[in-house]
From Swiss-Prot:
Species annotation: Phenylobacterium zucineum (strain HLK1)
EC top class named in words: ligase
Source lineage: Bacteria, Pseudomonadati, Pseudomonadota, Alphaproteobacteria, Caulobacterales
Entry GO terms, CC: cytosol
Record protein name field: Proline--tRNA ligase
Keyword Magnesium: no
Biological processes annotated in GO: prolyl-tRNA aminoacylation
The protein's Enzyme Commission number: 6.1.1.15
UniProt GO MF annotations: ATP binding; proline-tRNA ligase activity
Length: 439
């Protein structure tokens, strides 16, 4: 993409009402534009990042055996009345009437819809287990939307729902999602701590939140320090095997959000030098809730003995749009965003310091073409701007590599490369520079 033709409306200063770093930088980098309180248009740069995060989530769900569906944003109120949650959800639910006076709602979550789909088609234990997931826009009418995409009213969410014959099978599904979530966050360059959590309006018997540490986080976290350094399970685990040891390894150490914190247990279970109290951002929430939805909604299957039984369910949510802000909160500096390579909107930028000068243009085009051929999704900064302005805007939006082409370097047969994450610069022949970026 040539920056002279791209739409990237950067700002020199963030609006005064942007309170946290991620909101400020997303506005300054031209990633989003607020259209109403808690509702944002996603501009090209922001959409590229959003789509990359969505794809990482999708790949890890598929790897763990979940199956993608797409459910509607508008849902029938009658389904929520059937589950008993229509009145319980309160003012956060946006209620709508169509022209026929039928009650609808803009879905804040999808347990009812997915259970309705399941009960229409699945009738036997032989068709279990099933785990269906959906990446869709949701709406919760927050009283005080704030912090940009971190706490908006409209948000993109991945929600998965597992259906199993009994509690033991449901716990296996829960463990698969537990491990898959840790793999998602690792691929996004995040260190996530799983903590026991309150089940809230979703309900259920077992729940974990996944929290990344950030000073601006809304949650307070009490945890054993070893959890911060514990790696993700990785892609090569046996998804059909017993994952309980992997889960236990990460849950036997104390970790709790403020709602579930027990100070006496914390002091007993974690040595003083291992106790960590910090603020964090919730980036995922998983639940096992047994028959909470299947029983009132009559979602049953015939068991091996022919007798019908209610299925056991779990629910697993990741805020995809929220993750954009969370990554920025965890990875930025004074100059702007520092994206992990996995979600950067562009893999590298070729910076032409003298557009219109034939020799410089030729080397810049050569570098741009080579990076395209290598699949690096390069950006060619061919704008007629001062070098300092070019460097500042590319640092702001977080492009991981800059390959800088200027007349002096071209005359000497070299270019300069800069690694955004470290600030390290090297002067190299073009072939060596391309090799370093594409390695």
């Amino acid at each position: 993409m040539r920056l002279s033709r791209y739409f990237m409306p950067t700002l020199r200063e963030a609006p005064s009402d942007a309170q946290i770093v991620s909101h400020q930088l997303m506005l300054r980098a031209g990633m989003i534009r607020q259209e109403a309180a808690g509702i944002y248009a996603w501009l090209p740069l922001g959409l590229k990042v959003l789509k990359k995060i969505e794809q990482v989530v999708r790949e890890e769900m598929d790897r763990a055996g979940a199956i993608e569906v797409l459910m509607p944003t508008l849902q029938l109120a009658d389904l929520w009345r059937e589950s008993g949650r229509y009145d319980d959800y309160g003012e956060e639910m946006l209620r709508i009437k169509d022209r026929h006076e039928r009650d609808l709602l803009y879905g804040p979550t999808a347990e009812e819809v997915i259970t309705d789909i399941f009960r229409a088609y699945i009738k036997s234990y032989k068709d279990l287990p099933k785990n269906l997931y959906n990446i869709q826009w949701k709406f919760r009418d927050e009283r005080r939307p704030r912090f940009g995409v971190m706490r908006g009213r409209e948000f993109l969410m991945k929600d998965a729902y597992s259906f199993d014959i009994d509690e033991a099978a449901a716990r296996r599904a829960y463990n698969r999602m537990f491990c898959a979530y840790l793999n998602v966050y690792a691929r996004l360059g995040l260190k996530a701590i799983p903590v026991r959590a309150d089940t809230g309006p979703i309900g259920g018997d077992l729940s974990h939140e996944f929290i990344i540490l950030a000073d601006t986080g809304e949650s307070q976290v009490f945890a054993h320090r070893d959890l911060v350094e514990m790696g993700a399970p990785g892609p090569d685990i046996d998804w059909d095997g017993d994952l309980e040891p992997l889960v236990q390894q990460r849950t036997r150490l104390y970790a709790a959000s403020d709602e579930m914190h027990d100070q006496a247990r914390f002091e007993t279970e974690a040595p003083e030098d291992k106790r960590m109290t910090a603020r964090g951002i919730e980036v995922g929430h998983i639940f096992y809730f047994g028959e909470k939805y299947s029983r009132p909604m009559n979602a049953k299957v015939a068991g091996p003995d022919g007798a019908e039984r209610f299925v056991h369910m779990g629910s697993y949510g990741v805020g995809v749009s929220r993750l954009v802000g969370a990554i920025i909160e965890a990875s930025h500096d004074e100059a702007g965003i520092v994206w992990p390579d996995s979600v950067a909107p562009f893999g590298a930028a070729v910076v032409n310091l003298r557009p219109g000068e034939a020799a410089v243009d030729a080397v810049a085009e050569q570098a741009y073409g080579a990076l395209q051929a290598a699949g690096k999704e390069p950006l060619l900064d061919d704008r007629d701007e001062r070098p300092g302005a070019k460097f500042a805007s590319l640092d702001l939006v977080g492009v991981p590599w800059q390959l800088i082409v200027g007349p002096k370097g071209v005359a000497e047969g070299v270019v300069e490369i800069k690694r955004r994450a470290t600030g390290e610069r090297q002067t190299l022949p073009l072939d060596a520079a391309l090799k370093a970026i594409t390695a």
